[in-house]
Each structure stands twice: as C-alpha cells, then as structure tokens.
C-alpha cells in the first residue's frame, strides 16, 4: 500500500488486519509518510500503529508523539553506529488497548505457558512489551553478548554527536 495515498491505506484495512506498519523514512526511496494521518486511520479501525524508526533515530524523531503505539529500531545501524553488533529495540508507548479489539488473544486471554496470566490485566498499558519480555524472549532466547551490549552502548552515547554531524553535512 502506498503510504502517501491515505484513501488506499484506509481501503486496504480488512477484518483480519492486525496492525499498521510503516517506516519513518521508507526504504529504498527515503520517502516520509504522514504518520499523524496514518495513525488517525488506524485509530478509526481500532488498530495499533507500529513504526520502524531505524533511519529516523530516536534523536531526530519520536513517532509515539505522532500517534505510533510501538516503535522499533535496528540498533545495528544508527544507534550502534558502527555495524559491529546485531541488535534491535522495541519501544511500547503504552497507548494501545490490547484487550479492547479482541484481535490479540495471545495478550488478552489466559496464557497457559505462563500460569494463565492475562497480560492485559497483569501489565495494563505495558501488556505488549511485557508479553515480549516474558514469552518471546523466553521462546527465542534472543539476547546479546556483554561485549555487543557494550558496543551498542558506546554507539548510543555518541548518537547525538553523529546525527548532528550527518545533519551538518546534508
């Protein structure tokens, strides 16, 4: 779906649509979608908005302030800054009601693998990120080594300096 054609985006939503996913700077054209308008469409349909802010970086753009519910980043690129470590970031804005729509039983219904917990009741606005921590990380074992964590931390500490230099050079 062309993110610049808001009517097309609205028309593409079906009963089985789970979320609206977009990038702050689209790959490969670096196009910039109207996140506020797309978020309004998603809210009209009761859908969460997931924004990949890898190229926007948290230093330059904060999608949650523009209606995103979840923001993801590839930490390998600008956050790490050196391409030395693989990593990712998930930010849950706590703005979406996961129980209301009935589309996400894995969060809103009892989870038998986690003592019957309903993440929407146990974690409230943090239900999604709590599910990620409790279930997804448990099941996939996704974790980074201490050295890679150190490298990503170094990149984070210099993010503002590097992005300011990028901006000066544009």
What spans do the regions from the language model cover?
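Conserved PLP-enzyme active-site core in the AAT-like
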Residues: 1-170
């Amino acid at each position: 779906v062309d993110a610049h054609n808001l009517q097309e985006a609205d028309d593409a939503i079906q009963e089985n649509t789970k979320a609206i996913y977009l990038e702050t700077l689209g790959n490969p054209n670096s196009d910039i979608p109207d996140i506020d308008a797309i978020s309004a469409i998603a809210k009209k349909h009761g859908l969460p908005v997931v924004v990949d802010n890898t190229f926007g970086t948290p230093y330059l753009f904060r999608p949650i302030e523009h209606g995103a519910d979840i923001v993801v980043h590839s930490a390998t690129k600008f956050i790490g800054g050196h391409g030395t470590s693989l990593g990712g970031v998930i930010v849950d804005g706590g703005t979406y009601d996961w129980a209301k729509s009935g589309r996400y039983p894995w969060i809103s219904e009892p989870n038998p693998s986690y003592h019957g917990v309903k993440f929407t009741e146990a974690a409230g606005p943090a239900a999604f990120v709590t599910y990620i921590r409790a279930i997804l990380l448990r099941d996939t074992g996704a974790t980074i080594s201490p050295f890679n964590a150190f490298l990503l931390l170094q990149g984070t500490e210099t993010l503002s300096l590097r992005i300011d230099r990028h901006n000066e050079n544009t």
